């Protein structure tokens, strides 16, 4: 039986790779076709090959070693492509010594360029044109300069293995992402950071495994956005953040080797993080999975790395009311749409850019008929929407559009409804919420928007036998990709871990007429293929 270990789109969604217990393959996405298999190398008989005109990265180790050809018997844990170039990262699956070997290949020539051996199991690999990040089960992130495969930094983080019992060891998944763009931002949960994580040593290639010191722990406050009043201290340590919540996020610059921002995304622990292609949007999902959060990053015009990023906007997206594990978040190429896959077997699509006919008029969030159990509903829904994710704008009385902005904001509409209603404002529950607002001194300047609902969805036409759930540590796991078409909008591409099926769906076109906020359209299935 062939078991899928990993399904991965390349950075521009032009190709999808499948790694299995027997082989690995690469397929062109649109039009669909296999163009590489470890059984036969580059076939070129099905579909198109990658675009060789794309910028290639040439790695010459200069050591005179012979390049080894890829063997036919190739059980593979991971295969990662670099855009549409021939440079490919392969992690062979080895039951005896573990997944400790990383090989870099030139698939166009079917040759191995170099290989790296690590002291622990490799649980994930992230790469772009500048950086290669290798994440180990023992709790290290090895950061390489990909142009010469030179180790420049090792981040010591918490271990990804935990014992469920005395005999059984459970491997946790890596929650984080590396931006595809050359700025190479690495986004991590603060819960992964330890006292030994050397975040502030910027010496390139020197003492790459140097441990942290006490001065580092006193340097976090200048990096923090959206700090709640209860930890508003002169010195904010790593321990303070981790005691407050597991939902804090760290943005680390792998080019300058220093952190750029720390912010609180959720109250509960993080289940999924992804960063957009332009490094300007970060989407996060908590372990509850009811609310997805998209943060818009802004950096200074002079690109001064001593200054932290700013968060200019936060968009709240409601996946649903029932708790479900989110296992995939993916931005479209133009960053206007976010796809979200979860164990509910429904893939939701959210529009991040506001349509011309849309407004911030408040509408009651309709009851979800499929969520009858209020006990399972996330506590995030109220306290985080009201307290943690309100964006504070500096008061500017001279701004000409300040009144118009307030009128169109969610808060402006709600304020009109409750203005003059002392019963609402004097309600003990309301007063408790207001007291906990992190920016209550800027209450009049908050831009407050209700969570957006998905405008489109896909319900996969497949059944997953229960015995397959444990193979992938999450039910109904998928990989989501996007392709732009000339006239018909976005083409959705879905790859299923459980069945090995590859689907093409058509995303509905935006309507020219206003629609109800809870209006959702099912995507049309165009084609279905097998990746096995």
From Swiss-Prot:
The gene is ATG21. It is found in: Cytoplasm; Membrane; Vacuole membrane. This is Autophagy-related protein 21. Belongs to the WD repeat PROPPIN family. WD repeats lie at residues 265-310, 321-360. The keyword Protein transport applies. Residues 360-380 are annotated as: Disordered. PANTHER family: WD-REPEAT PROTEIN INTERACTING WITH PHOSPHOINOSIDES WIPI -RELATED. Coiled coil: none annotated. A motif (L/FRRG motif) lies at residues 317-321. It comes from Debaryomyces hansenii (strain ATCC 36239 / CBS 767 / BCRC 21394 / JCM 1990 / NBRC 0083 / IGC 2968). It is a peripheral membrane protein. The keyword Cell membrane does not apply. Contains a beta-propeller domain involved in specific binding to phosphatidylinositol 3,5-bisphosphate (PIP2). The L/FRRG motif is essential for the cytoplasm to vacuole transport (Cvt) pathway and for the recruitment of ATG8 and ATG16 to the PAS in nutrient-rich medium and in both its recruitment to and dissociation from the PAS under starvation conditions. GO terms for cellular component: vacuolar membrane. Residues 361-378 have a biased composition (Acidic residues). Keywords: Autophagy, Cytoplasm, Membrane, Protein transport, Repeat, Transport, Vacuole, WD repeat. It comes from the Eukaryota. GO terms for biological process: autophagy; protein transport. Required for cytoplasm to vacuole transport (Cvt) vesicles formation and mitophagy. Involved in binding of phosphatidylethanolamine to ATG8 and in recruitment of ATG8 and ATG5 to the pre-autophagosomal structure. Protects ATG8 from ARG4-mediated cleavage.
């Amino acid at each position: 039986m062939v078991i899928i270990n990993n399904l991965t789109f390349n950075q521009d969604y032009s190709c999808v790779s499948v790694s299995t217990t027997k082989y690995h393959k690469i397929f062109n996405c649109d039009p669909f076709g296999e163009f590489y298999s470890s059984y036969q190398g580059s076939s070129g008989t099905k579909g198109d090959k990658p675009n060789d005109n794309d910028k290639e990265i040439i790695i010459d180790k200069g050591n005179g070693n012979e390049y080894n050809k890829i063997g036919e018997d190739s059980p593979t844990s991971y295969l990662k492509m670099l855009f549409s170039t021939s440079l490919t990262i392969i992690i062979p699956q080895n039951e005896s010594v573990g997944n400790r070997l990383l090989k870099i290949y030139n698939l166009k020539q079917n040759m191995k360029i170099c290989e790296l051996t690590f002291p622990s199991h490799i649980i994930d690999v992230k790469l772009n044109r500048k950086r290669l990040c290798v994440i180990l089960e023992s709790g290290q992130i090895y950061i390489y300069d990909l142009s010469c495969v030179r180790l420049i930094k090792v981040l010591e983080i918490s271990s990804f293995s935990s014992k469920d019992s005395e005999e059984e060891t459970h491997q946790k998944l890596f929650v984080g992402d590396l931006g595809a763009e050359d700025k190479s931002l690495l986004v991590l949960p603060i819960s992964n950071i330890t006292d030994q994580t050397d975040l502030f040593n910027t010496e390139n290639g020197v003492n790459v495994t140097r441990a942290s010191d006490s001065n580092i722990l006193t340097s976090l406050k200048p990096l923090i956005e959206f700090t709640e009043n209860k930890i508003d201290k002169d010195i904010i340590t790593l321990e303070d953040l981790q005691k407050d919540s597991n939902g804090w996020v760290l943005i680390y610059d792998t080019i300058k080797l220093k952190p750029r921002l720390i912010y609180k995304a959720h109250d509960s622990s993080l289940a999924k993080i992804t960063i957009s292609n332009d490094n300007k949007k970060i989407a996060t999902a908590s372990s509850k999975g009811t609310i997805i959060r998209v943060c818009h990053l802004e950096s200074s015009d002079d690109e001064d790395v001593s200054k932290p990023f700013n968060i200019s906007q936060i968009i709240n997206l409601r996946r649903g009311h029932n708790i479900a594990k989110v296992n995939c978040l993916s931005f479209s190429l133009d960053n206007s749409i976010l796809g979200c896959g979860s164990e509910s077997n429904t893939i939701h699509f959210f529009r991040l850019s506001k349509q011309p006919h849309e407004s911030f008029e408040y509408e009651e969030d309709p009851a979800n008929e499929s969520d009858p159990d209020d006990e399972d509903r996330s506590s995030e829904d109220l306290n985080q929407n009201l307290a943690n994710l309100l964006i504070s704008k500096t008061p500017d009385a001279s701004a000409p559009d300040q009144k118009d902005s307030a009128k169109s904001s969610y808060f402006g509409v709600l304020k009109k409804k409750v203005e003059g209603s002392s019963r609402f404002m004097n309600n003990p529950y309301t007063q408790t919420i207001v007291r906990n607002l992190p920016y209550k001194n800027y209450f009049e300047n908050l831009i407050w928007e209700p969570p957006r609902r998905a405008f489109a969805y896909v319900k996969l036409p497949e059944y997953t036998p229960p015995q397959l759930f444990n193979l992938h540590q999450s039910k109904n796991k998928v990989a989501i990709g996007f392709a732009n078409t000339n006239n018909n909008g976005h083409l959705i591409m879905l790859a299923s871990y459980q069945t090995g099926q590859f689907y093409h769906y058509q995303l509905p076109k935006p309507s020219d007429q206003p629609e109800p906020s809870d209006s959702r359209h099912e995507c049309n299935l165009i084609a279905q293929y097998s990746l096995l």
